[in-house]
Amino acid sequence: MNNDEYLTALGQNAKQASYALATLSGQQKSALLRCIADKLTAAKADIVSANQQDVADAKANGLSDAMIDRLLLDETRLMGVISDIDNVIGLTDPVGSEIDSRLLDNGLRLSRRRVPLGVIGVIYEARPNVTVDIAVLALKTGNAVILRGGKETLASNKALCTVIRSAMVSQGLSEDCVQLIDNPDRSLVSGLLKLDKYVDMIVPRGGQNLQRLCAEQATIPVILGGIGICHIYVDAEANLEKAVSVIENAKVQRPTVCNALDTVLIHQSHAKQFIPVLAKHLSGLGVNFYGCDQTQAILTAEGLDVSAATDESFATEWLSLTLGIRVVADLDGAVEHIRQFSSGHSESILTDNIHTASDFMNAIDSAAVYVNASTRFTDGGEFGLGAEVAVSTQKLHARGPMGLEALTTYKWLAWGDYTIRG
């Protein structure tokens, strides 16, 4: 079987499996997800062992610490993933809900009802937890899914999918509801992007190269996002002591994720006072800096290392313990910088002035905009959506963390009495 035949078979099997999934009741889907959680718990030793193989291979191949952190699925992280399944089980199932209903003048009773999308293709890189997150959300909403993870996590993904597929069978469903492309051949990605006869939506979770590839080659609707060049603006009326803890959380808690902070913008009135305090605190936590001219002068005078910031560095999603710092004249300067360099993911303002906060929220056109909060909150679990499929930075169909509703569409239902159009 060549690659085209292989992908066609995957698509056909997924489409066929999706029909039965779409008819499941909420109770049946909850039972399925509970079965998956129980089987993952029972198989945790095998799953962790498979992940250790991936981690060992990654280290042998010289992958970065950031990449290794992304692919790590130890027992603690795995149990967190399983806990998220419980959260999803507890969420309201949007499928079958009525969006609106009205009686038309022509006598038709017209309504819109939420239904599954059908088959979702997800292409992702070194995050094995995504395998479970996506499968669970897809199944909760009655969708079949075709997964294509990175070669770095192949052993982990195989172990996870084997367990999930066994749960499907034990619940009387086709194992083809969840399929994994386990061949690392890159041409299969291009082929999947053109499988529009069977796949209804593509979600790429990865870096700019993957996003660009999908945007350029797909003949299927693509949800773009996941690239997070995130900003925090420290306003003239910010509480500086509290600001340090927010910035630390946004930058240091988990620097390898898309909602981590990349650039902090500081009002000029605080520059000489606040930048040294912030930099000394963060440098003690391993953070290094790229600064504008004024920031460089301030930090150099304090004996702290700093590299010269450029447009290229400000346009970089660091995914590491690196932070850009820029002094701005006012709110307008902060907004101008964000508009130029943001990826449209998450931005925050720290201020005690409610009017300035409101102006910031109105001016910034990103998927998530915060006042006095860390950008790290842009997450399906934190938003009460359960695990997320992705964080969309586009505006059509879905924006921000994609939970259950983002995996549904709707259809029009019209009831008549042998009604004809006049």
Curated annotation (Swiss-Prot):
Per the record's keyword annotation, is NADP included, yes or no?
yes
Q: Where in the cell is it found?
A: Cytoplasm
The gene it comes from is proA
* Enzyme Commission identifier(s): 1.2.1.41
| Domain of life of the native organism | Bacteria
Descriptive protein name: Gamma-glutamyl phosphate reductase
Q: Does the keyword Phosphoprotein apply?
A: no
Summary of the function given for this chain in its UniProt record: Catalyzes the NADPH-dependent reduction of L-glutamate 5-phosphate into L-glutamate 5-semialdehyde and phosphate. The product spontaneously undergoes cyclization to form 1-pyrroline-5-carboxylate.
Which species is the source of this protein? Shewanella halifaxensis (strain HAW-EB4)
One GO BP annotation is: L-proline biosynthetic process
The record, for PROSITE patterns, names: PROA
Q: What is its main location?
A: cytoplasm
Arranged from A to Z, the UniProt key words for this protein are: Amino-acid biosynthesis, Cytoplasm, NADP, Oxidoreductase, Proline biosynthesis
Catalytic reactions of this protein: L-glutamate 5-semialdehyde + phosphate + NADP(+) = L-glutamyl 5-phosphate + NADPH + H(+)
Report which residue ranges the record marks as coiled coil.
none
Annotated Gene3D superfamilies: Aldehyde Dehydrogenase, Chain A, domain 1, Aldehyde Dehydrogenase, Chain A, domain 2
